[in-house]
Curated annotation (Swiss-Prot):
This is Tricorn protease. PANTHER family: TRICORN PROTEASE HOMOLOG 2-RELATED. Keywords: Cytoplasm, Hydrolase, Protease, Serine protease. Belongs to the peptidase S41B family. Residues 93-94 are annotated as: Binds the substrate's C-terminus. The gene is tri. The record marks D927 as: Transition state stabilizer.
Length: 1030
């Protein structure tokens, strides 16, 4: 079977290509294939250089391929060399440190974002000794020199996950010289990628005709010609030796002759295979777990289920015929699994002693929650059709209990006698209401009747029955008590959750009342009509509770301590909570266990099974919670067949796209064709990166934003990461001379170079000559010397400008991007203040997430007080908080508090008085698009810059592939009054277009910021500011 071949280059009769994460060379004349690399990581984007005697290529490494560096091979000697030591990061769209091209003298030009405050690659000339000399030509991923001119490809990267892209960051080509300036010569309606030059024409890939094909223009960007007519697959990875063009398409390598447009497929044949069976540790891929009514446990990891005992010396693999997502014991002898395939999720019922399937029920949609009744007769599931379904396990009948219009029903409980099902039902007060609220409903299986337990005016969740079905407990976010914002004039509702209890029978009162037995009312039958009138809270403090579990003498409450959102938002780590017990008798709360991510309790309430952030499982008995025991699930080995895994993951990726794309009719129309087109290539996949090639192609067929593949498990290979010291260097006369020591606000934490905190007394112009006793310079670059030094102190020796030598310890960082960002912002702010004599404020918003909100408020409280304001959203990475920021900017000043002592205080506080200008660019996207559009629509001021990214179909990824990969699907299409859906795949046009050409970067001039200052000062001249007399 042929392999999936990618990333070709050509030199004469030799072809480079990547296959199975390795680099290979193929001879056109002899057909010989030769492997050039072995187990470096994931190799791609190789290029011949130095007259075909060497190859430079990129290696991606780390479990999720979150870093990359460049390597080379000498084809004569076989010497392998690591060229860069910067471990440039990747982002969701996988823009890495890469080979951009070659200078006239044959030097490698590197594109990387490693030294930038944003994930936008810039160009550097790589020296033989590892030095990196910035070209200062702005964002670019391709670089070509021809006839004394430089051709720069901005954003001309491969874009398989968004075909027919037309937004602001579509690929463009600039041409010119630093001395005479640059001109944008190719700017089509659609994206262009992989530009190369052969003789007097520029060739590239674009899909302006609806399918990816090779086009060309002359060297001035005119005379557009189409050369191929492909329809099934897109060509990718265009390269040339100046005569013949080579590319990959549909997993094969092709040559293209520019003289006659002849396309030839190369019959390279099978290249490589690998062991089809791979072994994995369950804790790395833990998805779900449960306990049996006896002494057995189950876990789901990497799509497979296992049953095991507490010592994990006995385990049974459950023999499912699909991808397992959840496991629930029905009894000591039976277990149920949620099993998925391309048609949806089904319930499989298995013998718990043998792991053999007994029957299968479904498909039932895509299931997001499942619970079993205590007697094992019923299962309740919630699916993506917003249904809650009741399943009779014995006969497989399925009954719809309820269906919401507004959201998933995934929060439910079954009474121990299997009569009642309580569930949290999503509802909105009207079709145009902003919030989805939830209230508790009760379904009586005996009488086939529904009851409202709570009203629809709050957010009620986590229903739970006591063992005797006398009470129904739930949590509610209705105890409003605002907390003061310590930074701005604001309040937030943080601790508003309390547990409530509802007696289900006449004569019952809250067990927390502890009424004397001689005055307790007579107990009666179920009284379900008046449930919503008799809820009462338990006497515990409000907190951020997530679940409640009734016990005989109290309840367990699981809460997450109030914390800042910043770290968890960006790290993706699950939150850690605390289990406490509230005892009815003494009304005291006792802490049971900390550091809990998720937990399950045994049916008799005596034992708890829980997980921590390390992915491992633990148990403890309620009477001795301090004596926890680790369940060594890694004693179980998961053995997977690679081909079967990839087929399953492909099916799931395709299914998620089909079932979640916002336009259901469109998805159903195109999905089957997409499936067949790429499914036949799955059998050619050998490595996870091969499969990624196909997944991104599937995503791209929907031709919509926010189709990403994130995370996952691509390789076990990692390399030491680069350390950072938040300094820039100029390589001069064999020495690394400090050209900048970076800092933002020097009084803030994490905003300054560690050089400023050392005893070195380093300054600009000093040279670093040693790190940890190793000379730095011609023999070793400073970047290589800092590899593996992150979060460590190193001994640095510098030569001062007066030739004196000093040594001192410097605390090396793992990442200095935030310091670079804050330095960039403070530099811009200082420039604005100086140019306007302090009259105009400056705010930059890096994204519309937690960091963006932080940065906005950090600056807003001081900058909004000036006579005008520049709001900079260039490079804004999107998020969800734009409306919170717009709310502040929209607030106009109405007056002042005029005190006897002190100065005036504006009303409303921090309101804007004066004109505003917003700057945007092609790297402002998603909620950055929405902000840019809204700034114009609300007439807050003039929007200047360049057209934005153009991606406003939102995502809410809820499922992972078996290796932890998160796939996003465009689910929520954004519609604007007056413009409809037009911002998607186009972007927002500024009122005034201001380009940022390459030569402006070279002279360190920001034409967009310059123009913003000019315009806001002109607007200020027309603005009348009124003040009271003091």
């Amino acid at each position: 079977m042929a392999n999936l071949l990618q990333n070709p280059d050509i030199y004469g009769d030799r072809i480079l290509f990547t296959c199975c994460d390795e680099l290979w060379e193929y001879s056109l004349s002899t057909g010989e294939k030769k492997r050039l690399t072995s187990h470096l990581g994931v190799v791609n984007n190789a290029r011949y250089y130095d007259n075909g005697t060497k190859v430079v290529f990129r290696v991606m490494f780390g479990q999720s391929l979150d870093a990359a560096d460049l390597f080379s091979i000498d084809l004569k000697s076989g010497e392998l060399k690591r060229l860069t030591f910067i471990t440039g990061k990747s982002v969701g769209r996988r823009k890495f440190t890469d080979v951009a091209g070659f200078s006239k003298d044959g030097s490698i030009i590197v594109s990387t974002d490693a030294f930038q405050p944003f994930s936008v690659p810039m160009l550097y000339k790589l020296g033989d000794d590892g030095s990196l000399d910035p070209l200062n030509l702005g964002p670019a991923v391709h670089y070509i020199e021809k006839n004394g001119r430089i051709y720069i490809g901005r954003d001309t990267y491969d874009l398989p996950h968004w075909k027919e892209y037309k937004g602001g960051t579509r690929g463009k080509i600039w041409s010119g010289t630093i001395e005479k300036g640059f001109k944008k010569i190719i700017d089509l309606e659609n994206h262009i990628s992989c530009p190369v030059i052969v003789k007097d024409r520029i060739y590239f890939i674009t899909d302006i005709d609806g399918a990816g094909n090779i086009y060309s223009t002359n060297l001035d960007g005119n005379d557009l010609k189409k050369h191929t007519d492909f329809h099934e697959y897109y060509p990718r990875h265009l390269n040339t030796d100046g005569k013949t063009i080579v590319f990959s398409m549909g997993g094969d390598i092709y040559t293209f002759d520019p003289t006659n447009d002849n396309v030839k497929s190369l019959d390279i044949g099978p290249v490589f295979d690998t062991d089809l069976n791979q072994s994995y540790a369950p804790s790395k891929f833990l998805e779900d777990f449960s306990m049996s009514p006896g002494d057995m446990y189950s876990t789901v990891s990497r799509g497979k289920a296992f049953i095991f005992n507490e010592n994990v010396n006995y385990s049974i693999p459950v023999k499912s015929d699909g991808r397992v997502r959840y496991s629930r014991f029905l009894s000591k002898n039976e277990i149920s699994l949620v099993i998925g395939d391309k048609d949806g999720d089904s319930i499989g019922v298995f013998d718990a002693g043998t792991g053999e399937m007994k029957r299968k029920i479904g498909p039932l949609g895509n299931i997001f929650s499942v619970k079993s009744s205590a007697d094992g007769k019923y299962l309740v599931v919630g699916n993506d059709n917003f249904q809650i379904l009741l399943i009779d396990v014995s006969n497989g009948t399925v009954k719809e209990i309820d269906q919401s219009r507004e959201g998933l029903i995934v929060d439910f409980a079954i009474s121990k006698d299997s009569r009642f099902i309580a569930y949290s039902f999503p509802v909105k007060s009207s079709d145009l209401a902003s919030y989805v609220q939830r209230h508790i409903k009760l379904f009586d299986m005996l009488n086939d009747k529904h009851y409202d337990v709570t009203t629809e005016t709050a957010n009620d969740f986590a229903p739970a029955f006591d063992a005797d079905t006398n009470y129904l407990y739930y949590l509610s976010n209705r105890s409003l008590d605002p907390s003061t914002d310590r930074f701005t004039f604001n309040f937030g509702y943080l601790n508003i959750t309390r547990p409530f209890v509802v007696p289900l029978k006449k004569g019952y009162v809250s067990p927390a009342r502890n009424m004397p037995q001689d005055i307790e009312p007579e107990k009666g039958e179920y009284d379900l009509e008046r449930l919503k009138y008799i809820s009462e809270p338990l006497p515990v403090d409000q907190a951020d509770y997530r679940s409640i579990t009734p016990l005989k003498d109290g309840v367990l409450l699981f809460s997450v301590p109030i914390h800042g959102e910043f770290s968890s938002y960006y790290s993706g780590q699950p939150e850690k909570g605390i289990i406490v017990k509230f005892e009815f008798k003494d009304k005291k709360v006792k802490e049971i266990k900390k550091e809990v991510v998720d937990f399950k309790i045994s049916t008799d309430g005596s034992k708890i099974m829980f997980s921590k952030q390390d992915g491992k499982l633990y148990t403890f008995r309620m009477e001795k919670p301090e004596e926890e025991k680790s369940l060594n699930i890694d004693a179980i080995t998961i053995v997977s067949n690679v081909k079967e895994d990839f087929a399953e993951m492909y099916d799931e990726a395709w299914k998620l796209a089909r079932d979640n794309y916002w336009d259901k009719e469109h998805a159903l129309t195109i999905s089957e064709k997409i499936y067949e087109r790429y499914r036949k290539l799955v059998e050619r996949c050998v490595t996870r990166w091969d499969l990624s090639y196909l997944i991104t192609e599937i995503q791209g067929e929907y031709r919509t934003s926010h189709s990403y593949e994130m995370g996952g498990y691509f390789t076990d290979i990692d390399m030491p990461r680069a350390g950072r010291i938040a300094c820039d260097f100029k390589y001069s006369n064999g020495e690394y001379v400090i050209s900048d020591i970076l800092y933002g606000d020097p009084s803030n934490e994490n905003e300054k170079s560690p050089f400023l905190l050392s005893t070195l007394d380093a300054d600009i112009g000093d040279a670093v000559i040693e790190i940890d006793g190793i000379p730095i310079g011609k023999g070793k670059s400073i970047y290589e010397a800092l590899v593996g030094k992150g979060n460590r102190s190193v001994l640095v020796k510098i030569r001062k400008k007066d030739n004196s030598v000093r040594s001192g310890f410097v605390d090396v960082l793992q990442d200095d991007r935030y310091i670079r960002y804050r330095a960039w912002v403070e530099k811009n702010k200082k420039f604005v203040h100086e140019r306007t004599n302090g009259r105009i404020g400056y705010i930059h918003i890096p994204d519309m997430g937690i960091m963006g909100l932080n940065e906005f408020y950090r600056q807003y409280v001081t900058e909004a007080s000036r006579n005008g304001l520049i709001v900079d959203v260039r490079f804004n990475g999107g998020g969800f908080v734009s409306q919170l920021i717009l709310e502040k900017l929209y607030m106009k000043r109405l007056g002042y508090d005029n005190p006897r002592r002190g100065t005036l205080e504006p009303y409303p506080m921090n309101s804007i008085e004066g004109p505003m200008i917003a700057i945007t660019n092609e790297y402002a996207g998603s909620d950055g698009d929405i902000f840019s559009y809204s700034f114009k629509a609300l007439h807050l001021g003039t929007l200047i810059g360049t057209r934005t990214w153009g991606g406003v179909v939102g995502i809410s990824p809820r499922r992972k592939l078996i290796d932890g990969t998160v796939l996003s699907q465009p689910e929520y299409a954004f519609w604007f009054k007056g413009s409809g859906f037009s911002v998607e795949n186009y972007g927002v046009d500024p009122d005034v277009v201001i380009e940022y050409p390459p030569e402006m970067y070279n002279v360190n001039v920001d034409p967009q910021l310059e123009r913003a200052i000019e315009m806001v000062l002109a607007d200020l001249e027309k603005y009348k500011i009124e003040l009271p007399k003091k």
